[in-house]
Structures are given as structure tokens and as C-alpha cells.
Amino acid sequence: MYILTAEAKDLYNTNHLKNGNGSGYCIRTKAGNINVKKFINALDYSLDLIKLREIYEKIYRRHDFSFKINGKEYTKHVINVKFSYAQKEFNKAGNNIYVRSGYQYKDIKLEDHICVVDDKLIGIEVDMEVDEPYKNLSVLEDYFTYEDGRYKNIGNDIILNKSELRQELYLYENGFVCDGIKYVRWKRSSGSSRVGKCLFINEALYQRMHKWETCNLKIKDGQPLDLAAFEAYISLTSSSIIDTLEIKPENFLLIDDYESVFKDTVVGVEFEEGHLVSKTKEYEIHNSIFDGESLIDESLVPDKYKHYGMLLLRNRFFKSASFNCNIQQWFKDNNITDTGQLNGFTLAQDISEIKIITTPSSIKYCKFGTAEQWLKLIEPTFGIVKHEKPTHYFNGRMVSCHYQLINTLQLTEKDMQDLLEPSFDYISKVRNDPAILRYHINYPYNEMPLTPLNSKNEIIFKLLGINENFSKTSLYYDFRDDLIRSMIRELKQGHVLINGNYSTLLGNGLEMLQHSIGTFNGESVIGKGNIHSTRFEYDKTILGSRSPHICAGNVLVVKNVANEEIDRYFNLSNEVVYVNAIGENIQQRLNGCDYAPSCGDTGMKTW
């Protein structure tokens, strides 16, 4: 759904016009229609959008929260505000045109490139030939001058800089008016805050939306608060989702997080006498082994997602990578028949109701209140943000490497030749065999629709599928040569295809099941230096690399081991790898990874 984007300085200016009409910032054309060209940002399908529509219909008693034009959906009840420019005494309103603060370009009439009202300069066009200068040049003040037959800009006063526009009462506290609707500050995501954007909302919707997104938390004036974290938490429901699923409060079992504490010899960085100094020494390592992950029973997973091993779920103050697990089978095998046998908190009255196991690290509300309060406040609709996916190369069997990893491995020239040899062989086959080229471009020839041909590439794709003799034409040769040049260019940038994939990390999942019934003894099931992945052969050495690859230390050499218990109780795909963080420095080696896929994806390669 598209939403309006506006500059803070324009909102400020149109809300402080000398001849203001009360309608504020104008989003309409001269004909009175909404100018959808200004709607350049999108409000993703999310829990926020679902709730916004619901609240709007309750308040206004109608169903026009959004409108459609040419197949696209728009809403004017949320506005994305940017703070890119300061508000100046004279603001640019087009090429070489300046308009005084408090006025709009449409309100001025330039005569010989200048507009003066009651001996006050309102607008001016600079660097253009003037037939005759204005009779009283003092109206130019210290902002403009007249020389060589043209008006020139020589200075400008800043009324409010970008920071002041953000903090100024006019926006954050008083809000602004747009198209006759009052808007107030709503929220911003961590990504938006980095680029200085913020969402504003129709004031009539704000109170109910804010009460909902904060789970009724009451933050008092002067109360100590990690504001950056709080803003991030209330923005969890604005994340784009692909689907929803229903989880009832009684389906939850909340267990304690577990921290593995041990010592390891690492290269540590310390601050000494005003300098950062790196030293190899023994440090105490703390790993939260269930950080950011949950276990979800297979029966709760929607049918179309049952073949995935992980679903990233969001709700109010909840964010967790939820791994496909046979929780009820675990309870049955361990003779757990009553909720009193569980090692955690639940609202369930019967053991069969337990469908998801999580920890306080996934429930952000626990930083402000209790898990019991959160369970009583949440609605059963959870958003599915994403799931693990195979790569696009060779049906997920290959993964594209990158120059950071190649530099980390410090390969010799001979090693590099060995690494590139399969790629060169493949390029040679693409050059010489049209069937392999067809496979490479991966075009669905059996489902070719009879549609207009919109590009040269599409013509090539379809002709290759229709007649093999097309591979003997000059058009085919040109296409093939362009493709090969592109493949070689990718190799030069370090994008080498290797046997591997991107895998989401599942940390100590079986230990989490043990912890849920009180049998966890603090020991790892697979042991140090091992992983469990169905993607690779067992008893083989695997090289894992953090993605994104931040530094040369983001590599992990481990052994892939078989484990019948993991296979029995977890429904893992090839893109989920079971890892161990008990007594093993995996989290810091991978730069503080947790098990949410936003920062726990790891490229795996047989080595």
C-alpha cells in the first residue's frame, strides 16, 4: 500500500502560511484530485496495517481507509516524513526560484522575475535576464543582489535546521495538518531512524494504535527508558509479513534462558592509556544458548509451510525464529502428561495445549513487565515474516561466494586455480552447449505464455525453447557472448559458485526440549566442534562463514555429525543447521550472532 512522502520543511511551511486556509499541506491537483505521484513510499502488509484498517473502520464507521487507482492501493492516513532540508528564510521552489517562508509558489506571481507585496520580497527568480530591475532594490535585503542584468542569491538565513525541525514542537508535539487532517508522530523503525525518516499518523487513529502497539504499557514522564530499544520493539509489528498464523496464549510454554559460561583463549581488544590494544589472552565467554529462538510444534505450522524448518514470527513485543519441532512427540516419549511436570510458565490447563516453547529473549515485553501480563494481552494472530530458502543456483546445491570470504581464506595461487576450475569448466559448457545455456538461464519453457515480447532477452528465451536451430544464429551468438562476459565479470568480483548453501542457525534445540521438562544437565548433545546438517554428508569437515562476512575471524571449521534424536524431534530442511554454543565460542566468533535469521545466516561449504 502506497503512502505519502513529504519533507518536514514543506510541512512546516504550509502549516505556517501568512494566508493559511487551515487545510495545511496540499496533496491535490488543480482539479481537486489526490496527486498520487507524491505517494512514493510503501506501507508493507503487516500486523500494523491489519490493525490500522480495523481501528479506522471502528472509528469512522466506513470502509474507505484506502483507495485504488490503476490497480494500486493508496492511503493518506499514514505519512512518511523526511528531514533532508532545513527551513530557510527563502526556500527553493524550482529551478532558480526562491519563495519566502510562509508563502507558496502557487501564491506568487512573478513579474520580470520578481514578486513584491507591500514592499516585501515574496519570490524571486535568479540568474535570468531582467528587462528592468525593481525600482527599490532594498527589498532584496541581504539575501539577493542585482548585477550584470540578473538577480543573484548571496545568502540565506536558516529558520530551523534539520535537528530543530525534528525536535520542534511544530512537528513532534503539535504535529501538522495535511489535506485537512491533523497528523501526529507515530513511530519509526531502526532502519528509518538511520536515514532520518519518521511515520506520522492521522491523529484520530493514534491513541488506539499506540495503546495497542505498546501492549498498554504506561511510560511516565521522567521514567528511565532505553528509548532506542523501545522504539525498535514497538516497530516489530510494522515488519513486512508474508502470512499469519494463529497461536493462542495457552499454547505457550515460557522457559528460562540458559547462559553457558566458560573460558577461551581469544584475541581481545582492550582500552589502555587512551589506545585500543589487541592481546591474545584468556577471557570469560558468556553464550545465551537459546537467544532469539523458539520451538513450534509441527501441528501449529500452516500446511503450506510444513516443509520449512524455520518461521520468523512477529507480534507485539515478540520476535523469534521458530523452528519446526515435534513438541508433543517429545512429551509423549518422556511420559510428560501433566503441565505440572513442565519446567516453565504456561497458561495451559492440558499438556496437549503446549505448541510453542520460547524464552524471555524472544519476548521483549519481559523487559517492562511479566510474561503472564504479555500472554494475557496478546492477540492470537502472529505474523510470518519469512522462512529459510534454498539458493537460486542449481536448485539450491550451490552458493555464490564473495571476495570477503576469499580474502579471509588466504588462498595460494594454486588453491585459487583449483577453486575456479569448476567455474571455468561450466562457462566453457555454456559457451559450447545450447542445452546447458538454456539450463543456466532457467527459463520455464513448458509454461511459455503467448504474451507480447517486451525485451531482447525474452525473445532469446522463447526462441531457444521453440527451435534448437536458433542456436546457430548471430542473435544467439551475441546473447551467449554477453552472458559469458557477465559470468566472467561476476568471477572477477569474487562471486564464485561453490558447493554449499545459506543456512539459518538452530542453537541447541534438543537441549531446549530437555530444559522444558527439567532434564537438561548443561551438556551439549552433539558436542564441541560439531554441527548437524542434512545438507552435507556426515563425518565430513565443513567450513562455515558468517553472512554478512564482517571480519576475517567470521569462519567456523566443524564436523557434520549424525544424530537420530535431532532427526526425530526436529523437521529441519537443508537450509537449517543445528549448532552448539555450550562451551564453544561460536556466538562471538560469528560476531554476536543470535538465532534470528536476520543475523544468523551462515554460508556453508564442504571443505
Residue locations for each model-derived region?
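Conserved small-residue
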Residues: 1-588
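Hydrophobic, aliphatic-enriched repeat segments that assemble into extended interaction scaffolds
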Residues: 504-507, 593, 604
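Duplex nucleic acid-engaging cores and interfaces of nucleic-acid transaction enzymes
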Residues: 594, 599
